[in-house]
Amino acid sequence: MSIKAIVVDTAGTTTDLNFIQDVLFPYSHQVMASFLAQNQQQVLVESCINDVRDIALEPSATVARVAEILQIWITEDRKLAPLKTLQGLIWKQGYSSLAFQGQIYPDFIEAISRYRQQGVAIYSFSSGSVEAQKLLFSHSEVGDLTPMFSGHFDMRMGNKLDKQAYLNIHNTLGLPPKQILFVSDTQEELTAAQAAGMMTCLMSRGDAFAPTEHKQVGSFTALNI
């Protein structure tokens, strides 16, 4: 059964993990307090602030305290919806001001065109919000790549380590799971996708190939459909 859709992880797969860890995360940590102070009246920001209070079990937390909690979560790389939403809003400002540009691996840029020419649809799946993914790909160093994608998925599909997230994705796409290939640098995510019936491929960039039950490549150049 031929592959009709490829779902790609972002950090470590299409995007240098160092860009996420050394540029995007520190930027959101640095400006979080001022961003909340300036935008706390916006409906979405206010909703995220209240969600942080609920998750942290601090219903009376000040906005400054909420910022501190979020900064701790950034340091801990917590996969929590209000944090990811706020990071997306903050990164939007950073991209717009040209504080940074999205760093996408050249082999993926080449491959995405090749796959589309073969009639294969491309989607991304990240713990970062859909908004953050669109920002990453629309403000890349080579320009706007979003027209090359057929869609994006985030934590609203479920936790990336849970089988249900991948069941939700293939139900959304309306394709048999065996026609969907999930590519990630994290074996636990691939195992969850495999349990949902998807085809899988481990992206091992710059490392010796690891023992795995999944197909394994060192770049998208080697991933032929």
From Swiss-Prot:
Write down the EC number.
Answer: 3.1.3.77
Keywords (alphabetical) are: Amino-acid biosynthesis, Hydrolase, Magnesium, Metal-binding, Methionine biosynthesis
Q: Which InterPro entries match?
A: Enolase-ppase_E1, HAD-like_sf, HAD-SF_hydro_IA, HAD_sf
Transmembrane segment boundaries: none
**CDD domains in alphabetical order:** HAD_EP (cd01629)
Cofactor(s) it depends on: Mg(2+)
Any GO MF annotation of the entry = 2-hydroxy-3-keto-5-methylthiopentenyl-1-phosphate phosphatase activity
Record keyword Amino-acid biosynthesis present: yes
Give the top-level enzyme category: hydrolase
Q: Tell me the SUPFAM superfamilies matching this sequence.
A: HAD-like
Gene3D superfamilies found in the cross-reference section:
1.10.720.60, HAD superfamily/HAD-like
The entry's free-text remark on the cofactor is: Binds 1 Mg(2+) ion per subunit.
Q: Which GO terms describe its biological process?
A: L-methionine salvage from methylthioadenosine
Pathway in which the depicted protein is active: Amino-acid biosynthesis; L-methionine biosynthesis via salvage pathway; L-methionine from S-methyl-5-thio-alpha-D-ribose 1-phosphate: step 3/6; Amino-acid biosynthesis; L-methionine biosynthesis via salvage pathway; L-methionine from S-methyl-5-thio-alpha-D-ribose 1-phosphate: step 4/6
Describe, as the record does, how this protein assembles with itself and its partners. Answer: Monomer.
Give the function comment from the record: Bifunctional enzyme that catalyzes the enolization of 2,3-diketo-5-methylthiopentyl-1-phosphate (DK-MTP-1-P) into the intermediate 2-hydroxy-3-keto-5-methylthiopentenyl-1-phosphate (HK-MTPenyl-1-P), which is then dephosphorylated to form the acireductone 1,2-dihydroxy-3-keto-5-methylthiopentene (DHK-MTPene).
Q: Which PANTHER family match?
A: ENOLASE-PHOSPHATASE E1
For this protein, the record's HAMAP family field holds:
Salvage_MtnC (MF_01681)
> Which named protein is this?
Enolase-phosphatase E1
Q: Which organism is it from?
A: Shewanella denitrificans (strain OS217 / ATCC BAA-1090 / DSM 15013)
Gene for this chain: mtnC
